[in-house]
Amino acid sequence: MPLKPKLLVFSHICSPQYVTGAEKVLMFMLRELQPYFTCTLVVPTEGVIAQQARAYNIPVICHDVPLVVPLYLALPHLMGEIESLQRTEAWPALIELIRREQPDVALVNTTVHPLPAIAAKMLGVPVIWSVMEAIRFTPHTANSAALIEHCADLVVGISEATLAPLRTPGLLPKSIIIPPSWNPDALHPESWPELRAIRRADLGVADHQKLVGYISASIFDAKGLDHFMQMAVEVSERFPDALFLIVGNPTDPAYFEQCLERARSRDLMGKFRWIRFEENVETIYPAMDITVIPSIEAEGFGMTALEAMVFGRPVVLYGAGGLAEIAGATGNSAYMARPGDTGGLFARVWSLLGDPARMAAAGAHNASAVQAAFGIDVYRRRIVHLVGLLAGRGVLPPSPVKGTGDTVYRFENGLLRPYRTGEALQADGFSYEQVREVSDLLIAMLPKGEPIGSLPPPKRGRRSRTAGRRRVLARARRKRGRRRPIRGIAAGRRRARRIGARHRRPRHPRRGRKTKR
């Protein structure tokens, strides 16, 4: 079988201690693309996702590529900064990397990482641009969109919010949405009750107490920790059994201390717990009773909201960007407050804490609704659609595919069209050596189109052989004077008796001869 197309994936960061939402989404997509591509990950330095990639048998290249933040911020000096970086040693080194690796496709992650896309475009390599955050709306947003339009053969957004600044006539036809998902096999739900008990014991949370959680890989002002603290202080003064958990790494220590001061000034620090980073989220979410996501700026998606719902937690959030889309898709609009409305956060959290039955029902609803909206089966159908688009646009070579069975198919407009015969495959310009083997899951999930080629001539089956045998016997009978063959011993005896009955005459005793007595 020929090799799968090579996909060179550029990650803008590789955090040494914790995984950001963008890194998590990228790694999940990379694993789901492995059935269709030979993937190689390019990271700026060693870190967590580099280790994860190697564990999944994905080669890793450490190669630092400068970021271009003005693309995301839509600043006027965007092109000037790119031209300045192209005059540094980093630019020819990037060109040489892509030339050496010779990928069939390049995937660029986030809107602060344009240099790999520009370099790949120059070398004639098709580009998939994964957009995980919403570009800022400024007078120069059109310049950012124009750069992406020029470089990208396909733009993959994780939400409507991420694609909103890119809804131009040139980008609309080549933009799709693939929201994040999760691998249910990696979460081990049977262990959640035990993990809940262990983690709550470690945090000093009793069974009768309610733990309200805030989680963000990086804590800075846009993530709204100060709004969470204001809500938490008000809740704790009215609900003595409420405790609060903060999970995340402060990237702005001054801001973090300012947030904690809200509780410290009221002598409420004993009600708060803090975990800087936890890679195994399955040990965190089960311990929470409610999860709050108070992002004050538009989120590209909102992985914490998704994860909390997967674990069956009630979620209270601000309707900022992708968070509003998650709330709408899962029927959680009642628990969505207007961004900046801390009173709205308080009212929703308070209503859940005061009604245990309602809190349990909200969690159960989330576990079911998030599966229907963002589950792994939905995600894989979208990946199949992505692969079909790439093949249809000529980004991928349209080589035929097969599963473990014998049927060979051709990708065409998101459909699998089976070849009726090997001659049909050859007439389409392919040999059997060009057929790629893919997972049976892909074959089962893709809708099937019209077969290719003419129906093969009918085969001579057992019935034809029987008819031939009868013709031979008939000829033999004609040669023997049309005598019918004797079928078996008993049949022969019966037939002999019938023949004898026709030809034998009755025997009479001879005259003059006496019978002895």
Say what each PLM segment does.
Residues T20-F28, K210, I219-E234, E257, ...:
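A conserved mid-protein helix/loop that constitutes part of the nucleotide-sugar donor-binding site
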Residues H188-V205:
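A short helix/loop element that forms part of the nucleotide-sugar donor recognition site in Leloir-type
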Residues A201, R358-A373, Y379:
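A short, well-ordered alpha-helix in the C-terminal region of glycosyltransferases
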Residues P314-L317:
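Short hydrophobic beta-strand element within catalytic cores of glycosyltransferases
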Residues V395-G468:
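Short, surface-exposed polybasic-aromatic patches that bind anionic ligands, especially phosphate groups
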Residues V42-V48, W182, I215-S216, L243-Q258:
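Glycosyltransferase donor-sugar binding loop
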Residues A329-T330, A334-T342, S351-P356:
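Conserved acidic donor-binding segment of nucleotide-sugar-dependent glycosyltransferases
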Residues G248, E257-F277:
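Nucleotide-activated donor-binding/catalytic signature segment of Leloir-type glycosyltransferases, i.e.
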